[in-house]
Amino acid sequence: MIIKKFLQKKIIRFINSQKVLKFFFYYHKFFNNKGLKDIGFDFSTKKNRKFIVQDIIDTNKYNSYLEIGCFDDELFDFIKINNKIGVDPVTGGTVRLTSDQFFSKNNEYFDCIFIDGLHTYNQVKKDIQNSLKFLNNNGVILLHDCLPNNFYEQATPRCQFTWNGDVWKAIVECRTNKDLDVYTCY
């Protein structure tokens, strides 16, 4: 009975997330008030982050990729690109350092940077600032875990298995920077 309720809840959440995606896609398409450029990706049709990241890389013909926080290499192994570096202090990727340690030694620039490291506002803010220093012209920085489903998923310190942390605060702050185009999707 518990498993059935759990599965029903997940299915309803998945169906609703598809509706939300379509709504936000069309809302931003028709009522976009910042005059932001189109990044060439229809968020309403491809939900999985692996396909989103790969499609952005392919569409823009990017050649270099940096992933901060690789954990089990699910995304890192999926991405097909000539030059890719994965940074994680514990497991996954190609470099065993914290993101701060990596950026202090790095001299390489990237077209696409995916941030999924330590899920705290302060660290993500530093990761964004450091990434901007090593981002090629017309490059993109992508962030994961920006939309917690409830209070506990965003609480710091971490108090449950599923955890987004307070990454969302970094997105809010980035939106105040007039030099950055910030896009969000569910």
PLM region descriptions:
Residues 1-114, 118-186:
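A short alpha-helical cap/connector motif
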